Curated annotation (Swiss-Prot):
Role description: Transcription factor involved in the cell wall damage response. Required for expression of numerous cell wall biosynthesis inhibitor caspofungin-responsive genes. Plays a key role in adherence, hyphal development, and virulence.
Protein name, per record: Cell wall integrity transcriptional regulator CAS5
Annotated Polar residues bias: 24-37, 208-218, 515-532, 574-584
One MF annotation (Gene Ontology) recorded for this entry: zinc ion binding
UniProt xrefs under Gene3D superfamilies: Classic Zinc Finger (3.30.160.60)
Disruption phenotype: Leads to sensitivity to caspofungin.
Keyword Secreted among UniProt keywords: no
Any one Gene Ontology cellular component term annotated for this protein: nucleus
Alphabetic keyword roster: Cytoplasm, Metal-binding, Nucleus, Repeat, Transcription, Transcription regulation, Zinc, Zinc-finger
Compartments reported by the entry: Nucleus; Cytoplasm
Region (Disordered): 1-61, 149-256, 369-408, 435-480, 515-584
Zn finger spans (C2H2-type): 622-644, 650-675
């Protein structure tokens, strides 16, 4: 913080101050209100000429020829028509004589102080000052200069991140620790002496400090060794008026450097990084060329990275290999390569056609004479690396463009995905394998047993002779595939004779065979006779028809039993006599209508409900004189009496219909529903 001037010039001794000079009568008054009088007094002091300011190394004033109007920040507002003559030193009075009437803040508009004089900039004395650095600042001499920062102001915290004096431009870069160059405020002295500055990539409207050629002010290594620009980015404070923008790292812009850092990170587990000497040269095109040894002090890079494989994708053969495509993967390093490789799920970990097993011992590869260097090589270098590596590893085979999925073997792998694929592949030919296995088991039996299968007239003897052997064979056949039920031996038909399959009837009930063979695990054998293997179709069909008839007769029997129950509820009764009709009928109309029905030929049999099942309802006061059914109204009884007659006096008159109904309301419902007519 000593780079900034903390005290006013009145507290320091000035070599050009005259002791007999009086203070300015306007020292304690407002400068803005007394500007005309102040200018007249400054013109009176022409006799006291101050010699031109020199720097302390004998050089002339470095402010000569500089245009501050182009380098000021955007918050300075002043009249662009003003001209400042820096060579006019005759109107420069002593600062002690002028005094410090007012100090203008940086945050205020600076248009008013610049109206002091139209010809001289030096008349605006000590109202602002630029801070001095360590080499040029001397406490015994305090020369005034054209300044932009107030003398009594506090050290700038965020407004001016870089304030340089005139000697900063010619001072050595290692005279003082420079500030960071990533601030977004434009420096006051950027041009024309800012040739050494380096712009940050990807930033616009940003200018770095003048003396930022070497970055020694980095916070983690402050004052220490030199920091590589590839690994550390310059971090600065975000200004108030600007938004924060994320800067891209230089390592991401240089693929060869990023590849080099990734290679070093992969080898940290096997050797010390301080003893690692990279034997590679940087070419002008940005690619790394491998050395002849292709080893880093005996460390094989292909063994350090478990995901490293030398086979080339089909797109590499055309010669289009970018820097990012050749960058190896950043994998965690470990000292034991076998244990580290076993921690990763790799589909090609056990396949030698993909580059060999990753669980191999690394001693053979560590001692080999040549191994592939995972760098940004051209297509020719990749072919050389793959050929040299194939001699070191016999199991390594590069994947070419003409290789297909069928040429890749999956039987050597042990992960879950390959197990599922291998199981699905084996299920396609499982039926043929099971059939051949059963044929081999049956081929080893004696001819006597086979003769019993085809020629024995007693099925009991044949089944009893074959059952113990089938128990042993079925136990062996199901030991490996117990979960497969559809391909079991009980459902496989022996392929001994083609005529046997031809004579097999289509109407054979397979459910009976499986149920019969499930108890003793014997092979299905159809019923046998003394003359032929299969029974005749005529004798076989009645059994099947009986089984089918028994299955279909069950629902019919249930329907008949339900109908019988309903009929049992109604007791068949003889037709009532006229006297009984008169007693049962509540009105004469009902009695007459019932007698007419009984006298007609279309009468139906009458079924009367049992009295104990009938529920008494006091609202239903009217009875049917024929079946004793109860109704609430007499018209309901008349409508009901029509159901006792088979006569259908109402007929549909629509063409191609002619249906008849015993009630008129049924005819209306028919016309509305079928013919869509409303009567």
């Amino acid at each position: 913080m000593e780079n900034y001037l903390m005290s006013s010039p009145s507290q320091h001794h000035h070599p050009h101050q005259q002791p007999h000079q009086q203070h300015n009568p306007y020292a304690n008054s407002d400068t803005l209100t007394n500007l005309p009088n102040l200018e007249n007094d400054l013109d009176f002091s022409d006799s006291e000429v101050v010699p031109p300011s020199k720097d302390y190394q004998g050089s002339p004033n470095v402010y000569d020829g500089l245009d501050f109007s182009t380098d000021m920040a955007t918050d300075f507002v002043y009249d662009s028509t003003l001209e400042f003559d820096l060579d006019d030193h005759k109107h420069m009075p002593d600062p002690a004589e002028m005094g410090h009437s007012k100090h203008f803040s940086v945050d205020r508009p600076l248009s008013a102080p610049f109206y002091l004089s139209q010809n001289s900039r030096t008349n605006f004395n000590h109202s602002r000052n630029i801070s001095l650095d360590d080499t040029a600042y001397k406490r015994s001499f305090h020369k005034h200069s054209a300044s932009l920062v107030s003398n009594a102001a506090e050290p700038p915290s965020g407004t001016f991140a870089h304030s340089h004096s005139s000697n900063t431009l010619q001072s050595s870069s290692d005279s003082m620790p420079q500030l960071s160059s990533s601030v977004s405020n434009p420096s006051l002295l950027d041009s024309p002496h800012s040739a050494m500055q380096t712009a940050t990539p990807g930033r616009r409207h940003k200018s770095s400090s003048v003396s930022s050629h070497t970055n020694l002010y980095t916070t983690p290594l402050r004052g220490g060794t030199h920091v590589s620009p590839l690994t550390h980015t310059k971090v600065g404070k975000t200004p108030i008026g600007k938004t924060h923008r994320r800067n891209r790292s230089r390592a991401s812009l240089e693929p060869s450097s990023a590849h080099l850092l990734a290679t070093v990170a992969n080898m940290k587990g096997t050797s010390n990084a301080s003893n690692l000497a990279l034997s590679s040269a940087q070419t002008p095109s940005g690619h790394l060329t491998a050395s002849t040894s292709q080893h880093f002090h005996g460390i094989n890079l292909s063994e350090a990275n478990p995901f490293h494989n030398e086979f080339v994708s089909p797109g590499v053969g055309s010669g289009h290999l970018s820097d990012h495509d050749a960058t190896p993967l950043n994998t965690p390093a470990g000292r034991d390569h076998s244990s580290m490789a076993s921690q990763f799920f790799t589909p090609i970990s056990h396949n030698r056609s993909f580059g060999g097993s990753l669980l191999e011992s690394s001693s053979s590869a560590m001692g080999s004479a040549a191994s592939a260097f995972p760098s940004n090589l051209s297509s020719n270098d990749l072919s050389v690396a793959s050929s040299s590596n194939s001699s070191a590893r016999p199991g390594m085979a590069p994947l070419r463009r003409n290789d297909t999925l069928d040429s890749i073997t999956i039987e050597d792998q042990e992960d879950d995905a390959c197990k599922q694929l291998r199981k699905a592949k084996s299920f396609t030919s499982f039926a043929e394998q099971r059939m051949s296995q059963l044929m081999k088991q049956r081929a080893g039996k004696s001819s006597k047993d086979l003769g019993n299968v085809f020629t024995d007239s007693t099925p009991d003897a044949s089944s009893s002779g074959r059952s113990p052997r089938k128990d042993s064979s079925s136990g062996n056949s199901y030991s490996k595939s117990a979960s497969v039920d559809l391909l079991s031996a009980s459902l496989v038909v022996p392929d001994h004779n083609d005529s046997y399959l031809k004579s097999y009837p289509a109407s054979m009930d397979l459910a009976s065979i499986t149920n019969a063979s499930s108890g003793n695990h014997a092979s299905p054998s159809p019923p046998k006779t003394s003359s032929r293997l299969m029974p005749p179709i005529e004798s076989q069909e009645p059994s099947s028809s009986r089984s089918r008839g028994s299955s279909t007769s069950k629902p019919r029997q249930t329907l008949a039993s339900a109908a019988a129950k309903k009929l049992n509820k109604k007791v068949p009764q003889t037709y009532p006599t006229a006297s009984q009709i008169q007693k049962a009928a509540t009105t004469e109309d009902i009695a007459k209508f019932a007698e007419s029905i009984l006298q007609s030929e279309n009468k139906r049999p009458i079924f009367v409900k049992k009295q104990e099942e009938e529920v008494y309802d006091p609202k239903k006061k009217h009875k049917c004189p024929l079946c004793l059914a109860r109704f609430q109204r007499p018209e309901h009884v008349k409508r009901h009496l029509k159901s006792h007659s088979s006569e259908k006096p109402f007929q549909c008159e629509e063409p191609n219909c002619g249906r008849r109904f015993n009630r008129k309301d049924n005819l209306k419902a028919h016309l509305k529903k079928i013919h869509h007519k409303n009567l």
